[in-house]
């Protein structure tokens, strides 16, 4: 008879600082029978695992390979391979992810497949890079009736720049080009954060022509664009 995992937890482990790991996440990680750790390449260090490793000494750990490629058909094979690994486990397991499992997370793809198989899934929230970056910049994201927009890689920024008070851009590669839509405007300020809450965190806030964007051309960088109300 084929085994079917009893329960799967999608656990957000935050963004870097181990002290930001939630009590609920620690509770789940300590009680599960196995912890699955997503990696983008075999042999590559997992940021998520580095965050939790001091708390899970002696636990059963297994890697899940999710390469950083855009071809969804190729990626689907890796998701399905991960699913089969998870399904064959007895008891309860956790799949960890940096940030929060509900926001641009690798876990969401496996979540869909698990739900299709009728597996019980519970999501354990983690602190997202969005909130960690706002804290690093020491600014509120939105207040009152202000509107917030999240854009992956700044896609279609020109469509939303005048509609929202705050725009979050996840993954800031080639951001300088995308921000040309506000080049000659003085009603916006830009905050950039690289590796929020890590020891080598880098933060800058200012106008477009005051920022060296090359320093933030990184997978773990994020931009917050805020409009001033006159």
Curated annotation (Swiss-Prot):
Superkingdom of this protein's organism: Archaea
InterPro entries the UniProt entry points to: 4pyrrol_Mease, 4pyrrol_Methylase_sf, 4pyrrole_Mease_sub1, 4pyrrole_Mease_sub2, CobI/CbiL, CobI/CbiL/CobIJ_dom, Uropor_MeTrfase_CS
Pfam families, sorted: TP_methylase
GO molecular function, one term: precorrin-2 C20-methyltransferase activity
Alphabetical list of PROSITE patterns matching this protein: SUMT_2 (PS00840)
Enzyme Commission numbers on file: 2.1.1.151
Alphabetic keyword roster: Cobalamin biosynthesis, Methyltransferase, S-adenosyl-L-methionine, Transferase
UniProt keyword annotation of Nucleus present: no
Reactions mediated catalytically: Co-precorrin-2 + S-adenosyl-L-methionine = Co-precorrin-3 + S-adenosyl-L-homocysteine + H(+)
A GO BP entry: cobalamin biosynthetic process
SUPFAM superfamilies from the UniProt entry: Tetrapyrrole methylase (SSF53790)
Tagged with keyword Protein biosynthesis: no
Membership in a protein family: Belongs to the precorrin methyltransferase family.
Protein name, entry field: Probable cobalt-precorrin-2 C(20)-methyltransferase
Name of encoding gene: cbiL
